[in-house]
Amino acid sequence: MVERLLESSASWSNFFIFFGLAVLLLFAVLGFVTYGILAERKVMGFMQGRVGPNQVGGRFGLLQTVADVLKLLLKEDSIPKAADKPLFILAPIIAFAPAFMVLAVIPFTSQFQFADIGVGLLYYIAISGITTIGVLTGGWASNNKYSLLGGMRAAAQMISYEIPLVMSVIGIVLLTGSLNLNEIVASQEKVWYIFAQPIGFIIFLIAAVAELNRTPFDLPEAESELVSGYHTEYSGFRWAFFMLAEYVYLFGMASLMTVLFLGGWNPVLFLDFIPGAVWFALKFSAVVFLFIWFRVTFPRMRGDQLMEFGWKVLLPIALANIFLTALIKELFF
């Protein structure tokens, strides 16, 4: 359906159809964020020997996050007197908008994708980098030393780990010969790239956790050091925008990892009677669970350890993986 709309001439009817689909995707992502946070709290509770949310919405706390969202919307929206007001207001929007934009190129099934462009992988990497500007702007505009430190940490971390993240997928591009995400999924019909590119997968996984600012790489928001990091001065729905961006990126990064390394909607052998959407959802859920598991398990790294690990360990291994992949392809394919 989307492909037919893209091929048709521009019209108001097509505009409203695309707008409706975008709103539908937005609500689907917001639903994931709402219950993804709840799932994370329940899983963390289980791993730490606690119950987790169990009061609002029954014994499983099904409405706990809904209540939290309502609380955030009703909280006072305060702007510090010394803050740069225009930038302070604009920063959460700059941080959130790219998080939603990157979802346009991710193919969730063979039929469901908003924009099947030839350089979908490059588009995702390029657009996701804009969020760094929003985070740094928020830290600067707050006129608070903790916010500024958090923003500078976030910028340094995201730039440092985006390089090995990009390097880790070059092996896949070499094997596939394309930056199109649909073609990457199609090339994994027989063998998933988690088996063909195990080194690339490990590098991508570690760099993805760092890009998401999640434990053990959550230095920009380190509560014990920086109060709340770059969004210390934010409250209410503006603070919610930053949190929303973080969890929408979790949705996007888990989806991208599913597409790049786990075969997307391709089924496991002899189980092709199960719909592709179900396979995508199962693989996606496994990746999200892995991110949550990391958060519960690992302690926070020091800043110097973080930078040293990115530049001195991940980057050389990623470069070696590119060389090895090119050599194997030249010799055996």
From Swiss-Prot:
Instruction: From the record, give the cysteines joined by S-S bonds.
Output: none
Q: Tell me where it resides.
A: Cell membrane
Recorded catalytic activity of this chain's protein: a quinone + NADH + 5 H(+)(in) = a quinol + NAD(+) + 4 H(+)(out)
Look up and give the membrane topology term: Multi-pass membrane protein
> GO terms for CC?
plasma membrane
Q: Which keywords does this Swiss-Prot/TrEMBL entry list?
A: Cell membrane, Membrane, NAD, Quinone, Translocase, Transmembrane, Transmembrane helix, Ubiquinone
What terms describe the molecular function in GO for this protein?
NADH dehydrogenase activity; oxidoreductase activity, acting on NAD(P)H, quinone or similar compound as acceptor; quinone binding
Q: Which Pfam families match?
A: NADHdh
Q: Name one GO biological process term.
A: aerobic respiration
Its EC number(s): 7.1.1.-
Membrane spanning residue stretches: 15-35, 88-108, 117-137, 159-179, 191-211, 241-261, 273-293, 313-333
Q: What is its EC class?
A: translocase
The answer to whether UniProt assigns keyword Transmembrane helix to this entry is: yes
Q: Determine if NAD is one of this entry's keywords.
A: yes
* Family in the record: Belongs to the complex I subunit 1 family.
* Described function: NDH-1 shuttles electrons from NADH, via FMN and iron-sulfur (Fe-S) centers, to quinones in the respiratory chain. The immediate electron acceptor for the enzyme in this species is believed to be ubiquinone. Couples the redox reaction to proton translocation (for every two electrons transferred, four hydrogen ions are translocated across the cytoplasmic membrane), and thus conserves the redox energy in a proton gradient. This subunit may bind ubiquinone.
Q: Assembly state and interactors?
A: NDH-1 is composed of 14 different subunits. Subunits NuoA, H, J, K, L, M, N constitute the membrane sector of the complex.
Name the chain's protein. NADH-quinone oxidoreductase subunit H
Q: What is the native source organism of this protein? A: Bacillus cytotoxicus (strain DSM 22905 / CIP 110041 / 391-98 / NVH 391-98)
